């Protein structure tokens, strides 16, 4: 279809889904993850990738949205999801056998127009059918990348039409023999890097301790790519075990940064109240 941008096509504001972290919503520049787009969240193991996605799912459900979770890693924990505020009984969960099946399910969900957000956890676990049916040790060079490339070509148009947010979680691998620059790369070839409107790099920067006991992680998220606002901003927040993103701690940090809350030593005060 061809159209003229003369105002007859109403320019609407970009719809977003909150990440559950105020600082990250601000860093994204539009107040959350953009709908009708592909988002990639990647980082090392235990950095909070799935937690961040489940926080966003909880926010989407709070606004009356319908969410689907494609669990290719077969590691979804409903008890933990419920603690983060996810209405597990309203969540569509799929645990596919092959990468092709997972992406086919994703495409069907998107085309139906009945879901607002789809999470694929994770790209690394989308194993091509030929690899599953083959023997251990067989070489399947480029198969995973080809699968992703083909699926994203199909998906991207449907995602825009139905205004669905699709989030791909990805893992990090090391490139061998890299002398200069970062040796880190994400799995599944280059297609996802191109098709993503937002790419988030999530890292664990430290531990939160209560006495000797570790009760959470300090987390930093960098916006590596952003097609809907200026990129390269970052957010820092705490993820507490069994609770998710520490909303109160983040609110205080942002308040201090913007001189709304005064900090003196270990005390915080707002309008004279400590």
Curated annotation (Swiss-Prot):
This is Protein RecA. ATP binds at residues 43-50. Belongs to the RecA family. It comes from Neisseria cinerea. It comes from the Bacteria. One of its GO terms (cellular component) is cytosol. It is found in: Cytoplasm. One of its GO terms (molecular function) is single-stranded DNA binding. Keywords: ATP-binding, Cytoplasm, DNA damage, DNA recombination, DNA repair, DNA-binding, Nucleotide-binding, SOS response. Can catalyze the hydrolysis of ATP in the presence of single-stranded DNA, the ATP-dependent uptake of single-stranded DNA by duplex DNA, and the ATP-dependent hybridization of homologous single-stranded DNAs. It interacts with LexA causing its activation and leading to its autocatalytic cleavage. Pfam families: RecA (PF00154), RecA_C (PF21096). PANTHER family: MITOCHONDRIAL DNA REPAIR PROTEIN RECA HOMOLOG-RELATED (PTHR45900:SF1), RECA (PTHR45900). GO terms for biological process: DNA recombination; DNA repair; SOS response. InterPro entries: AAA+_ATPase, DNA_recomb/repair_RecA, DNA_recomb/repair_RecA_CS, P-loop_NTPase, RecA-like_C, RecA-like_N, RecA_ATP-bd, RecA_C_sf.
């Amino acid at each position: 279809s061809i159209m003229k941008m003369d105002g007859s096509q109403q320019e609407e504001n970009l719809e977003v889904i909150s990440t559950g972290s105020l600082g990250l919503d601000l860093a994204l520049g539009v107040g959350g993850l953009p709908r009708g787009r592909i988002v990639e969240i990647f980082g090392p193991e235990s950095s909070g990738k799935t937690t961040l996605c489940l926080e966003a799912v909880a926010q989407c459900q709070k606004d009356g949205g319908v969410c689907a979770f494609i669990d290719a890693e077969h590691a979804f924990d409903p008890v933990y999801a419920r603690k983060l505020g996810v209405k597990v009984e309203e969540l569509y969960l799929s645990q596919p056998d092959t990468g092709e099946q997972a992406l086919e399910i994703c495409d069907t969900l998107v085309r139906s127009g009945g879901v607002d957000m789809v999470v694929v956890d994770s790209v690394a676990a989308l194993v091509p059918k030929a690899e599953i049916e083959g023997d251990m040790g067989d070489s399947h060079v480029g198969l995973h990348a080809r699968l992703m490339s083909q699926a994203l070509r199909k998906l991207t148009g449907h995602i825009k039409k139905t205004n669905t947010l699709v989030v791909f979680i990805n893992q990090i691998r090391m490139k061998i023999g890299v002398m200069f620059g970062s040796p880190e790369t994400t799995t599944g070839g280059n297609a996802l890097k191109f098709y993503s409107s937002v790419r988030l790099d999530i890292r664990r920067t430290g531990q939160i301790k209560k006495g000797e006991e570790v009760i959470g992680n300090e987390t930093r998220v960098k916006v590596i790519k952003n097609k809907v606002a200026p990129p390269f901003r970052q957010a820092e927040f705490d993820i507490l075990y069994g609770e998710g993103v520490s909303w109160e701690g983040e609110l205080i940090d942002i308040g201090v940064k913007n001189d709304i809350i005064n900090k003196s030593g270990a005390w915080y005060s707002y309008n004279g109240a400590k």
